């Protein structure tokens, strides 16, 4: 079971975003490092995932960042063992 905090400030490129996801969620070595692969991997994750500094993520990645966040929300909706939320940036540090 994970209790992961994803830091949007570290997600400055697509590669950096997938590095953060891989590390924080202990994703398997075969994780494909794209949003479809993230969706598949999140089906196996149980626990709580919190994203901080969404503003930095969205500034750096734009539409891809928004799709990443949507993927996390959608996966949590479909996986009863996964909770996803966004932290108030004033309380994240």
Regions found by a protein language model. Give the residues of each.
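Positively charged, polar, low-complexity stretches
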Residues: 1-93
């Amino acid at each position: 079971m994970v209790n992961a905090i994803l830091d949007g400030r570290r997600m400055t490129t697509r590669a950096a975003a997938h590095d953060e996801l891989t590390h924080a969620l202990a994703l398997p070595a075969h994780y494909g490092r794209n949003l479809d692969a993230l969706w598949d991997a999140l089906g196996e994750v149980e626990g709580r995932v919190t994203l901080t500094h969404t503003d930095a993520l969205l500034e750096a990645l734009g539409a891809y960042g928004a799709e990443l966040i949507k993927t996390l929300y959608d996966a949590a909706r479909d996986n009863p063992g996964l909770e996803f939320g966004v932290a108030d940036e004033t309380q994240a540090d």
